[in-house]
Amino acid sequence: MKIIKRNGAEVGFDITKIIIAITKANESVEEVDRMTPVQIQRIAESVELQCQKMNRAPTVEEIQDMVEHYIMAHGAFEVAKHYITYRYTRSLVRKSNTTDDKILSLIECNNEEAKQENSNKNPVVNSTQRDYMAGEVSRDLSERILLPQDIVEAHREGIIHFHDSDYYAQHMHNCDLVNLEDMLQNGTVITGTLIEKPHSFATACNIATQIVAQVASNQYGGQSISLTHLAPFVQVSRDKIRASVRDEFDTVGVAVTEDQINSIAEKRLREEIRRGVQTIQYQVVTLLTTNGQAPFVTVFMYLGEAKNQQEKDDLALIIEETLLQRYQGVKNEKGVWVTPAFPKLIYVLEEDNIREGSKYWELTKLAAKCTAKRMVPDYISEKKMLELKVDKNGNGHCYPCMGCRSFLTPYVDENGQPKYYGRFNQGVVTVNLPDIALSSGGNIEKFWRIFDERMELCHRALLCRHERLKGTLSDAAPILWQYGACARLKKGETIDKLLYGGYSTISLGYAGLYECVKYMTGKSHTDPSATPFALEIMQYMNTACKKWKEEHNIDFSLYGTPLESTTYKFAKCLQKRFGIIEGVTDKSYITNSYHVHVTEEINAFDKLRFEAQFQHLSPGGAISYVEVPNMQQNLEAVLQVMRFIYDNIIYAELNTKSDYCQVCGWDGEIDIVEEDGKLIWRCPKCGNTDQDKMNVARRTCGYIGTQFWNQGRTQEIKERVLHL
């Protein structure tokens, strides 16, 4: 059995340390108040047994809480008092050196929490370690100085989650839609160098990757770019290649027709498109930003964005090449084609491509083939977006999420024109819904009273995020605020006007709707008798956001939180505060946002239909998924799910497995098994358990994770049932 030390390191459980600690406290009291060695032994054994029942590695703090409980249960109150005093004294010593232990454990690569915090960061790499070290300092400053203590305590206790506190000390925002069109058409500046409008498609792709890297280094969340903004440069290259071909034939004195010139030019153009798309794919997965990871970037593929038919056809060529290259994958260090995590791809389903026989149907079939093998693209329904994302003029709009799932709300600028690219999200604070339910003890009046208190806590925490950005000078991130990614402000100008009036959003996240409803009603939120209560909770949070928006002129919106590592933290906090409650706190994870519980038997179509009503009530962003087996030999079923998505839900994805064992070459599913009280990954063919010698890709929270996960998320992945 393992335990987690305060610095995040994972070590073996040692019962003698508990015995020694209790004995020291025991020897410091009068003899009449002392416990016997047998009693001390029993306490230590009780703690050991309780730790074993947790089915995860307990923390030192949790073990000490157990020790206190059992000492007092034995009636040894004087011993307990001395034990608590000693513990408090040691805590004061540690607080005087708040970050040293954690930073040292990061450098020595024995911090288990850091290793499993982010499934797309490799904590062994120097650049990632530097980011984690900076994050520890930022988190420490934020918790000791910058944030109100009640918000810090609520975050520590898992009552709320103040996202990305390791970046809070700096004036950074969350995620955005990069205005690539403006930057390519009007030029931009990268690290002091003027980048003018590109004169070819290949150059435009290269510039786009440089922009992506710069943007990622100046924010902590995801970003999205649209292939539509690259499409005009296909015609630029076409004209350039035609002129070159004509010149070549003129030089050698050979007479050719325009059709012959066009035929040769199109072949060369296809090769340039291939190279340009390859540049984006390989640059994105090989670049390391200042965040110590590849850019969290989403590539949006929407034929309906094209300005004319020629641009739409050229966009179709880019989309086709993007899908072909993603289907192929990238090679790992063994030279085997595997699934890359980035860029995330989103394909928009629309009337031009969703019906068999429609103009771009072949593209949709290729997308289905790619999804079945590589888990992307994910799918957005133009039909549902136009129906549900309606601006104040009554017009519906289809546009990408910012990175993983965070959606902007509809917005019309001062000229009455819709605007999406160049807008951003200020930050997220998530409320732990099961904690509200458990704190109420099942009393509905108390539940809503506590809900109000938690909403106000989140409100204040979100305003902290907002105030941290307020007054930020455009000079803090020129690529974002001065050179087009988000705006073209003057040097020395603040970004304040972009924080109000709906230009940017700020998100109230929520997690564990299933567990919350389960505790309050005794039933899953899919049960017809419990669904109205679940929807009432959703509406309650939306009402709070509307109230705050009117009060501050800031666009608060409700967001279905993708808990990656936080799912484990929330679960541990709930177990610590309320114990193990069957169906509510008996897992090492809690359910993302409104999702159907991963163990619940439900078919893909019923799941998407059920979750669609909750997605509509999450205007700040949400995504639904269905878990499927290997579908490469059943593409018709994939297409059937895609057609259902088009007609029923805004945004959804299909999850499958994509693994490879570098020891024996196994390319089926890598198993999750329990060993010494810990979940590990093991090749079913050769038994390899070395994570450095296997490639495992799983959907974590909208993105594909490839660097493994903490114990909570790993248990959630293990317990997922298939929906097809």
Each model region followed by its residue ranges:
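Short amphipathic alpha-helical segments with coiled-coil-like heptad repeat character
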Residues: 15-19, 75-78, 307-315, 521-524, ...
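Amphipathic, well-packed alpha-helical segments that form the structural scaffold of globular domains
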Residues: 23, 459, 463, 514-518
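Contiguous, well-ordered alpha-helical segments that form the cores/surfaces of helical PPI scaffolds
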Residues: 301, 506-519, 539, 699
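Conserved catalytic cores of very large enzyme subunits
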Residues: 89-502, 523, 527-689, 695
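Charged, amphipathic alpha-helical regulatory modules used
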Residues: 1-109, 718-723
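Metallocofactor- and cofactor-centric catalytic cores in central/energy metabolism, strongly enriched
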Residues: 273-277, 281, 519, 713-719
